[in-house]
Swiss-Prot record:
<feature type="compositionally biased region" description="Low complexity">
    <location>
        <begin position="376"/>
        <end position="386"/>
    </location>
</feature>
<feature type="topological domain" description="Cytoplasmic">
    <location>
        <begin position="64"/>
        <end position="74"/>
    </location>
</feature>
<feature type="transmembrane region" description="Helical; Name=6">
    <location>
        <begin position="278"/>
        <end position="296"/>
    </location>
</feature>
<dbReference type="GO" id="GO:0005000">
    <property type="term" value="F:vasopressin receptor activity"/>
</dbReference>
<feature type="transmembrane region" description="Helical; Name=3">
    <location>
        <begin position="114"/>
        <end position="135"/>
    </location>
</feature>
<feature type="topological domain" description="Extracellular">
    <location>
        <begin position="1"/>
        <end position="38"/>
    </location>
</feature>
<feature type="region of interest" description="Disordered">
    <location>
        <begin position="355"/>
        <end position="386"/>
    </location>
</feature>
<feature type="disulfide bond">
    <location>
        <begin position="112"/>
        <end position="187"/>
    </location>
</feature>
<dbReference type="Pfam" id="PF00001">
    <property type="entry name" value="7tm_1"/>
</dbReference>
<comment type="function">
    <text>Receptor for oxytocin. The activity of this receptor is mediated by G proteins which activate a phosphatidylinositol-calcium second messenger system.</text>
</comment>
<comment type="similarity">
    <text>Belongs to the G-protein coupled receptor 1 family. Vasopressin/oxytocin receptor subfamily.</text>
</comment>
<dbReference type="GO" id="GO:0004990">
    <property type="term" value="F:oxytocin receptor activity"/>
</dbReference>
<feature type="topological domain" description="Extracellular">
    <location>
        <begin position="297"/>
        <end position="311"/>
    </location>
</feature>
<dbReference type="GO" id="GO:0001992">
    <property type="term" value="P:regulation of systemic arterial blood pressure by vasopressin"/>
</dbReference>
<feature type="compositionally biased region" description="Polar residues">
    <location>
        <begin position="355"/>
        <end position="375"/>
    </location>
</feature>
<dbReference type="GO" id="GO:0005886">
    <property type="term" value="C:plasma membrane"/>
</dbReference>
<feature type="topological domain" description="Extracellular">
    <location>
        <begin position="176"/>
        <end position="202"/>
    </location>
</feature>
Length: 386
């Protein structure tokens, strides 16, 4: 049957492959082979992505757990986005890595369906939690006086997770363990030909990529407009203050009012603009990482002559997983104090452990501790451990 994608990249979360060959001639010809050199490159890339995604997002969750600002609205969404990235690492990247090593799926039919289901759950969750965080930043800028409503935030996150679980359900029906050659079984997708693969991949592309990108663009368009309004108000207020200073006491009250408006605009900008920059960079990383993936997916189902076995075509499929290991570095860039506090707490607790485990070397340990924290001797993390 048409649409069988070689080199085992059909094991990706959204597989555009059709049912295995059913013609007797295909059965007797033996199972399809793969490019072993390319497979080794895939394994190396996936190992690196898995390590970075697991270690980076685990550090983010640990830092968020130990920070003093646990109830921050932004940190709440960062936590769930990191959990979604861990789901991608464990249930999408890791199975794909094992699959590239073994070439064939070795497991029962239930495991085949479960793996394919969880792969798409992570994809949906990572996308829509990022969308939810961006909507929250948009509301924070456009409605700065909006009260913090933690139950509403939790309900929105819960609804997002449940929606992702439901939206991924078709994977359970599409994928199954099937015989691809005489005595050779693999986890394959079965579509109604010829429109099945086109309909499903197009729907996934719309739901996970195109619609979220449109909404994200609208969010940051509104944010940019609001920031421009604030800057214009700030400029007008500064001009009014300058005029008031030259017109004497009669205009003094107007000058003070203008100064108050200037301070208000400054406060909004300083409090929000950094988090907006962070989420904007995360969105850019999402677009850069996922665009090649969905481009080759759509190309493979809408063009019968697409080079499905080309190296560049296959490597482009792997770039999507990079998004899960990029996010922790973006968090570190914009919220570096989180990781600074985490490192301080770790070093402080390690030093405290050394002092208690070596009572005969108290003076040496105390000297080491003072030199280690000479740059941050007043930090709260040090006080909590001492």
């Amino acid at each position: 049957m048409e649409g069988v994608l070689a080199a085992n990249w059909s094991a990706e979360a959204v597989n555009s492959s059709a049912a295995p060959p059913e013609a007797e001639g295909n059965r007797t010809a033996g199972p399809p082979q793969r490019n072993e050199a390319l497979a080794r490159v895939e394994v190396a890339v996936l190992c690196l992505i898995l390590f970075l995604a697991l270690s980076g997002n685990a550090c983010v969750l640990l830092a968020l757990r130990t920070t003093r600002h646990k109830h921050s609205r932004l940190f709440f969404f960062m936590k769930h986005l990191s959990i979604a990235d861990l789901v991608v690492a464990v249930f999408q990247v890791l199975p794909q890595l094992l699959w590239d090593i073994t070439f064939r799926f070795y497991g029962p039919d239930l495991l085949c369906r479960l793996v394919k289901y969880l792969q798409v759950v992570g994809m949906f969750a990572s996308t829509y939690l990022l969308l939810l965080m961006s909507l929250d930043r948009c509301l924070a800028i456009c409605q700065p006086l909006r009260a913090l409503r933690r139950p509403a935030d939790r309900l929105a996150v819960l609804a997002t997770w449940l929606g992702c679980l439901v939206a991924s359900a078709p994977q359970v029906h599409i994928f199954s363990l099937r015989e691809v050659a005489d005595g050779v079984f693999d986890c394959w997708a079965v579509f109604i030909q010829p429109w099945g693969p086109k309909a499903y991949i197009t729907w996934i592309t719309l739901a996970v990529y195109i619609v979220p990108v449109i909404v994200l663009a609208a969010c940051y368009g509104l944010i940019s407009f609001k920031i421009w309004q604030n800057l214009r108000l700030k400029t007008a207020a500064e001009a009014a203050e300058a005029i008031a200073g030259t017109e004497g006491a009669a205009a003094g009250s107007r000058g003070r009012a203008a100064l108050a408006r200037v301070s208000s605009v400054k406060l909004i900008s300083k409090a929000k603009i950094r988090t907006v920059k962070m989420t904007f960079i995360i969105v850019l990383a999402f677009i850069v990482c996922w665009t090649p993936f969905f481009f080759v997916q759509m190309w493979s189902v809408w063009d019968a002559d697409a080079p499905k076995e080309a190296s560049a075509f296959i490597i482009a499929m792997l770039l999507a997983s990079l998004n899960s290991c990029c996010n922790p570095w973006i968090y570190m860039l914009f919220t570096g104090h989180l990781f600074h506090e985490l490192v301080q707490r770790f070093l402080c607790c390690s030093s405290s452990h050394l002092k208690t485990s070596r009572p005969g070397e108290t003076s040496v340990s105390k000297k080491s501790n003072s030199s280690t924290f000479v740059l941050s001797q007043h930090s709260s993390s040090q006080k909590s451990c001492s």
